């Protein structure tokens, strides 16, 4: 336990908070190139084939990104836009791919929550 005099001389340093999305480097989104597109299975209570892409970002990081929505057109060398946001049942997936931006097509026949999937308003 330090004395008051010791605290005046050398005050306590606040703990630094670690960022949840280090690959974005404090930017809202980042561009990247897909190096591998595949499906993976989620953690224990859930069961599915989740679509995932390994992306090399302009910040130099390479990380796993989730492809939201039903169906996608991504393949190796596709240019994608990345946003933050983890997928709770996929370990190591801390980013989402933005649908309807760059090479990623929007989700077809989407009627509700369209802005999340880059879909235009149906006529």
Swiss-Prot record:
One of its GO terms (biological process) is translation. Disulfide bonds: none annotated. It comes from the Bacteria. One of its GO terms (molecular function) is structural constituent of ribosome. The modification 3-methylthioaspartic acid is found at residue 89. Residues 1-28, 104-123 are annotated as: Disordered. Keywords: Methylation, Ribonucleoprotein, Ribosomal protein, RNA-binding, rRNA-binding, tRNA-binding. Residues 108-123 have a biased composition (Basic residues). The keyword Transferase does not apply. One of its GO terms (cellular component) is small ribosomal subunit. Signal peptide: none annotated. The keyword tRNA-binding applies. It holds the Pfam family Ribosom_S12_S23. Part of the 30S ribosomal subunit. Contacts proteins S8 and S17. May interact with IF1 in the 30S initiation complex. NCBIfam families: rpsL_bact (TIGR00981). With S4 and S5 plays an important role in translational accuracy. Interacts with and stabilizes bases of the 16S rRNA that are involved in tRNA selection in the A site and with the mRNA backbone. Located at the interface of the 30S and 50S subunits, it traverses the body of the 30S subunit contacting proteins on the other side and probably holding the rRNA structure together. The combined cluster of proteins S8, S12 and S17 appears to hold together the shoulder and platform of the 30S subunit. Belongs to the universal ribosomal protein uS12 family. This is Small ribosomal subunit protein uS12.
